[in-house]
């Protein structure tokens, strides 16, 4: 028997896609959690700005700054970090202090939640990941933001550590490129990378967006209701977006996550909306095979785009497209998966001759996916076909009736894109 697996993938009630996509309630809950973090970050900076304004009026000594900060959310930092925040605010030069007093954090969600490829967790311990960048429009002086790197990071950490202290089970973790707040009972963590962007450039773009009636809230960065076309109003030059780093001598790294978003959206427009579904399915396969440590989401997304960008395929045949991707995926990785970011020479995944044992195991596991999909198509019964599919994607789908006997029909194929290769993205962002 030859089985049609398209409904297994695409059925909105019982198919794989229905087990991966967040419900409206679940999506709203994630936005509410994100908003809690944003509001706390605003509050923390408002408190710190007020203290800086008092210093400007010459009404506070260093000890006075320390005592006043002890009455704010900064009290959730360690004693040493509280003292450091006090010192940094007290010792600011006048220009930096004026910048700081007028500083208003902005927020911009990035990663899979923004790309619409965020899947529900499958195995215990797996979590949904929201990457919500905090952007600081400020004066950039001699290629570095004027306001101190350490102060900004400590204030972002203050917001997360205060939430950790006030919410049972929440846990703060420090990462090189972000602060993370883990919310285990929601199977979620929120990563908060911090960026500095030029104030003058941001204000120019903000004014332009206002005139086009695009801004529906305090800033386009903060709107969760705008569609993707509206988000084009964010046009701060990519080489002016500075990501704060916590480790090593380098404090800032040029990194604009919107380049990743634009690259993926452009790829979906050029190749077809099915790219998002294929990326979801590949991430579902990854999550079923590894609880942690499988191929990264950005590497899977890049490989899928590379394959579908050049290979003829039927965009209405998800089963056939998945089989095509699964067949070519190991070679795509073994060649050395280049980042679409031409400014970064580091590969997303090393070539075969440079792979360590774990990376070789990843590729070997990839090879089994194609075999499983072929075996499922040729299984004796639909129940056997479902069992094979669940080997690949986990026991998410339970309705074997979604799998039907195949009917021969002419197929309309999508030719490979004749457009230029997808434009390069900045790989320094970590995507989930």
Curated annotation (Swiss-Prot):
Glycyl cysteine dithioester (Gly-Cys) (interchain with C-13 in Cap2) cross-link: located at 432
Record text on cofactor binding: Binds 1 Mg(2+) ion per subunit.
The EC number(s) attached to this protein equal: 2.7.7.-
Sorted alphabetically, the Gene Ontology BP terms of this entry are:
defense response to virus; nucleotide metabolic process
Which part of the chain holds the cross-link Glycyl lysine isopeptide (Gly-Lys) (interchain with K-? in acceptor proteins)?
432
Under the heading Pfam families, the entry gives:
DncV-like_NTFase, DncV_C
Q: Mind telling me where the Glycyl cysteine dithioester (Gly-Cys) (interchain with C-513 in Cap2) cross-link is?
A: 432
- The residues listed in the UniProt record as binding ATP, with positions renumbered to this chain, are 180, 255
Where is GTP annotated to bind? 110-115, 283, 297, 344
Induction context = Part of a CBASS operon consisting of capV-dncV-cap2-cap3.
Q: Where does the record put the Glycyl cysteine dithioester (Gly-Cys) (interchain with C-493 in Cap2) cross-link?
A: 432
Known catalytic reactions? GTP + ATP = 3',3'-cGAMP + 2 diphosphate
Q: Which GO terms describe its molecular function?
A: 3',3'-cyclic GMP-AMP synthase activity; ATP binding; GTP binding; metal ion binding
| Keyword ATP-binding attached | yes
Disulphide bridges, residue numbers: none
Q: How is its activity regulated?
A: Primed for activation by Cap2 which conjugates it to cellular proteins. cGAMP production is induced in phage T4 infected cells in a manner that requires Cap2 and Cap3, as well as a C-terminal Ala or Gly residue in this protein.
InterPro entries recorded for this chain? DncV-like_NTFase (IPR048445), DncV_C (IPR048446), GAMP_synthase (IPR047805)
Query: What does the entry's PTM section describe?
Result: In bacteria expressing capV-dncV-cap2-cap3, this protein is conjugated to about 130 cellular proteins by Cap2, most of which are involved in metabolism; more conjugated protein is found in the absence of Cap3. Most conjugation occurs via an isopeptide bond with the epsilon-amine of Lys on the target protein, but Cys-conjugation also occurs, including to Cap2. Conjugation or deconjugation from cellular proteins does not change the DncV activity in vitro, but does so in vivo during infection. (Microbial infection) During phage T4 infection is conjugated to at least 2 T4 proteins (fibritin (wac) and dexA.2).
> Which cofactors are named for this entry?
Mg(2+)
Q: Which residues bind Mg(2+)?
A: 129, 131, 191
Q: How does it assemble?
A: A Cap2 dimer is bound on either side by a DncV monomer.
Q: Which family does it belong to?
A: Belongs to the CD-NTase family. A02 subfamily.
**Role this protein plays:** Cyclic nucleotide synthase (second messenger synthase) of a CBASS antivirus system. CBASS (cyclic oligonucleotide-based antiphage signaling system) provides immunity against bacteriophages. The CD-NTase protein (DncV, this protein) synthesizes cyclic nucleotides in response to infection; these serve as specific second messenger signals. The signals activate a diverse range of effectors, leading to bacterial cell death and thus abortive phage infection. A type II-A(GA) CBASS system. Catalyzes the synthesis of 3',3'-cyclic GMP-AMP (cGAMP) from GTP and ATP, a second messenger in cell signal transduction. Its product controls the activity of cGAMP-activated phospholipase CapV, a patatin-like lipase that is a direct cGAMP receptor encoded in the dncV operon.
Q: What is this protein called?
A: Cyclic GMP-AMP synthase
Native species: Escherichia coli (strain TW11681)
